[in-house]
């Protein structure tokens, strides 16, 4: 029974491409459909999206510059739609796979590093040596800062996959428990229904929060390297 909870994370080949690839394409398609079209008088959905847009625009502009806003906002939309789609029954959740999340995080850190080297040349390596530190401690500090810099990519990807995996497992266990209570106590017992509704709302909140944290940390890493804070 316990092994069945992990079957939702299994990568399956479908028509020469995996379910993981199909979900990524579906997330992009759904995002394009839901985000297209602007009305002069916005409806509630457009008002929510404009609020999110304004928030991210201000966040990225203040920390790393407006030129990076399209990338960070697109990253947030992509991850949040992947996370939300994964909440539906029998839908594969791409972001629970460490290979996918580490691929995203390492691509971001490598891209940021190359951008910093292109902009600052060898002066970019000054981020590995804290300002005002004693010269005698330079070898140790450079080693520590190098390990810390590399660990950014690892922690960024692992955090997303681990939190979503734990949430989905908890959701599956409690949903199964609630369904058993529902069939045992009768359809008029509201308690198991409330359990499933609460867990669903909690998982939706976690899906959005984790996408936001991933995008926020990406913005911070951009600020630390591109602006050389």
From Swiss-Prot:
Query: Cross-referenced InterPro entries, in alphabetical order?
Result: ATP_synth_F0_asu, ATP_synth_F0_asu_AS, ATP_synth_F0_asu_bact/mt, F0_ATP_A_sf
**What gene is it encoded by?**
ATPASE6
Q: Which GO terms describe its molecular function?
A: proton-transporting ATP synthase activity, rotational mechanism
Report the membrane topology from the UniProt record: Multi-pass membrane protein
Q: Which UniProt keywords apply?
A: ATP synthesis, CF(0), Hydrogen ion transport, Ion transport, Membrane, Mitochondrion, Mitochondrion inner membrane, Transmembrane, Transmembrane helix, Transport
Q: List where in the cell it is found.
A: Mitochondrion inner membrane
Q: What is the protein named?
A: ATP synthase subunit a
* Family recorded in the similarity comment: Belongs to the ATPase A chain family.
Q: How does it assemble?
A: F-type ATPases have 2 components, CF(1) - the catalytic core - and CF(0) - the membrane proton channel. CF(1) has five subunits: alpha(3), beta(3), gamma(1), delta(1), epsilon(1). CF(0) has three main subunits: a, b and c.
Q: What CDD domains does the annotation carry?
A: ATP-synt_Fo_a_6
Report the function annotation for this chain: Mitochondrial membrane ATP synthase (F(1)F(0) ATP synthase or Complex V) produces ATP from ADP in the presence of a proton gradient across the membrane which is generated by electron transport complexes of the respiratory chain. F-type ATPases consist of two structural domains, F(1) - containing the extramembraneous catalytic core and F(0) - containing the membrane proton channel, linked together by a central stalk and a peripheral stalk. During catalysis, ATP synthesis in the catalytic domain of F(1) is coupled via a rotary mechanism of the central stalk subunits to proton translocation.
Family annotation (NCBIfam families): ATP_synt_6_or_A
**Residue intervals passing through the bilayer:** 14-34, 68-88, 98-118, 124-144, 157-179, 189-209
Domain of life of the source: Eukaryota
Gene Ontology CC terms, in alphabetical order:
mitochondrial inner membrane; proton-transporting ATP synthase complex
